[in-house]
Amino acid sequence: MELDGALGLHGWQWLFLGEGLPAVIAGVVTLFYLTDRPEQAEWLSPEARGWLTNEMARDRAAAAHGHVTLGASFRSARVWLLSFAYFLNTSVTYSVFLWLPRILEDASGLRGVRLGLLTTIPFVFTLAAMVIVGRHSDRTGERKLHVAGCALVGACGLALASASGSNVPLLLVSFTLCQSAQRSIQPVFWTLPPLLLGGTAAAAGFALINAVGNLGGYAGPSMMGWLKETSGGYGPGMLVLAGGLVVLAAVVASLRLPQTRPN
C-alpha cells in the first residue's frame, strides 16, 4: 500500500482504519436514525407504516399458532433450491472479488494504487446497475426473470473474460458486464424466500439459505486457485463460474412464484 509508513502506521493498519471507521460511523448514525417500532419511523409514509405494522402483527399471530423449525427447512425442496442458487451466486461474488486484482495485475503489470483504481472500474458501474435492476424489479413486480436474466448476462461476461487473455480493456469490459449483472442478483434474490415460504417459515429458511449459500465464499475462490494452478491460466475457472450462473438461472426460472404487485 502507498500509505505504508504514513503517520507512523503500517499499510495493514491503514487498511483496518479504512474498513473499520465507516462501520463505526454507520453504527452511530443507525443508533440515532433507526426507531424501535414502525409507527415511530417518520421517514416512512403513513401508508408504509400502517402496512408494516399490520404485517408484523400478522406474523406474530401466525407464530402464536406454531413455529417452523430449522429441521422443517431441511426437508423443504424449495429451501434447498434457493440455497443452491445462492451458493452459486456467492461463489462468483467472492471469486471475482478476490481474483480480479490478480488477473488485472498479471494482464497490465500495474501495482499499488494504480492497480487498485483499475480494479474499481467495474464496481463503479455495478453500483448503478444494482439500483436500476432493483428499482425495475420493484416497479414491475417481477422477480425470477430479473434474477435469471442477470445470471445469464453475468455468465456471458465471464465467458468473454475467459477469452480476453491479457487484453486489459476487454477484461475491464467483460468484468464490468459480469459484475453489473451478477451483483444485481442478490437484492432481488432475497425477495424470493418470503414469496415461497412466508410467515415464520421464512425466518428458518433465510437462516439455512444464508448458511449454505455462504459456503460458496470458500468453494468458488478455492476452485479458481486450483484450476489456475493446474491449467496455468484463469480461463477454465471463469468458465466454470459462468456455467454456475447458467445453472443458477435455470434453477430460479423453474420456481413457481405467486404474482406480486408492482410498486
Report each predicted region and the residues it spans:
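Small-residue (Gly/Pro/Ala) motifs that create kinks and tight helix-helix packing interfaces
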Residues: 1-3, 26, 30, 101, ...
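Helix-to-loop junctions at the C-terminal end of transmembrane segments
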Residues: 129-142, 228
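C-terminal transmembrane helical hairpin of 12-TM major facilitator-type secondary transporters
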Residues: 143-192
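A late C-terminal transmembrane helix in Major Facilitator Superfamily
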Residues: 194-233
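Symmetry-related core transmembrane helices of the 12-TM Major Facilitator Superfamily/SLC fold
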Residues: 13-32, 238-253
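Extracytoplasmic gate region of multi-pass secondary transporters
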Residues: 71-134, 186, 190, 220-221
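Juxtamembrane helix-start elements in MFS-like secondary transporters
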Residues: 111-119, 171, 202, 206
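Juxtamembrane intracellular "pre-TM" segments in multi-pass secondary transporters
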Residues: 38-82
